[in-house]
Amino acid sequence: MESNLSGLVPAAGLVPALPPAVTLGLTAAYTTLYALLFFSVYAQLWLVLLYGHKRLSYQTVFLALCLLWAALRTTLFSFYFRDTPRANHLGPLPFWLLYCCPVCLQFFTLTLMNLYFAQVVFKAKAKRRPEMSRGLLAVRGAFVGASLLFLLVNVLCAMLSRRRRAQPWALLLVRVLVSDSLFVICALSLAACLCLVARRAPSTSIYLEAKGTSVCQAAAMGGAMVLLYASRACYNLAALALAPRSRLDAFDYDWYNVSDQADLVNDLGNKGYLVFGLILFVWELLPTTLLVGFFRVHRPPQDLSTSRILNGQVFGSRSYFFDRAHCEDEGCSWEHSRGESTSMSGSLGSSSWYGTIGREPGWCGGSQTRTTPLLFSQVLGPGGHHHSLYSTPQT
């Protein structure tokens, strides 16, 4: 064997693409990054319990998905320290869990964010047009259907490719077209929902303000998601278009030239390992880290000076986003409260997140008056004057 190789290729040319020390350093760097994200999300889940936030909410489900995603990616890269051949030749179930399932979890987190903000927008519109509330079921069904379609396509493609029952190029083409189209659509939907939440002030932007997030930050995060996932789709399609159908080795990236996951069964080379890590960093670790940072758990205020007062009730800044998500389905009032407010006393049940509606003519030129919600809400004094909730009412 040695004589045949020496006759074909000079001995000096038989060197690895990357030195072993570089490969080991890359493995340590990849594992450390994913492990740091894992412990960061794990700590935030403990903060939910420590601060007394709602245990089952959009926020906790989102963090749990990110925790599982980071755990699977950390486990995958830990194989490459000593057991690289085993990582490249896994059985169908371990292969799907380590390579394919993290991509599905990432898509589920994206659809979860879309679902929540879409509900916020629909509930804001339903105040003026009650028939809009019927469309909320259609929105939920659409996102659930998209998640199931994404999961089904990825599972089938992974199983068929591992059993060699279909052409790898055809499977990759189907998966890339479906998966990346859904990623781009959901990213555009998330950006649109964030813009609507920010623009429909004050009825919806209260969520961003109470969260401590500005409109610019929300728009920047949405724009970053669109750019990242759109570039991901373009990269995948370009890799497939430039690769021959018989062997997918375009750009010398071996079978990791498609960024979603590995569907072919060739061994992972050193150059492919380097590019695989960079791809996961740009198109998986970076967007997930941005979302985790944007929806992180906040510490509630400990004193009344940093709390908000609404109709005599004191609310901390933790009444934001996902901590009160149960209000959407557990009977919290989203209806308009009618009648004049004559004092700062009252109950939360007679108001809504979006403020109250009074019957004082002359303000805004109509028969109804609409107060701004939560942080900027006002009540009527005895003389018909408006007094800010941050000032002492006149007696």
Swiss-Prot record:
CDD domains: 7tm_GPR137A (cd21474). Keywords: Autophagy, Glycoprotein, Lysosome, Membrane, Transmembrane, Transmembrane helix. Its main location: membrane. It is found in: Lysosome membrane. One of its GO terms (biological process) is positive regulation of TORC1 signaling. It is a multi-pass membrane protein. Glycans are attached at N4, N257. The chain crosses the membrane at residues 32-52, 61-81, 90-110, 141-161, 176-196, 223-243, 275-295. Residues 1-31, 82-89, 162-175, 244-274 are lumenal. GO terms for cellular component: lysosomal membrane. The keyword Disulfide bond does not apply. The keyword Glycoprotein applies. Residues 53-60, 111-140, 197-222, 296-395 are cytoplasmic. Lysosomal integral membrane protein that may regulate MTORC1 complex translocation to lysosomes. May play a role in autophagy. May activate Wnt/beta-catenin signaling to modulate epithelial cell function. Belongs to the GPR137 family. This is Integral membrane protein GPR137. It comes from Bos taurus. The lineage of its organism: Eukaryota, Metazoa, Chordata, Craniata, Vertebrata. The gene is GPR137.
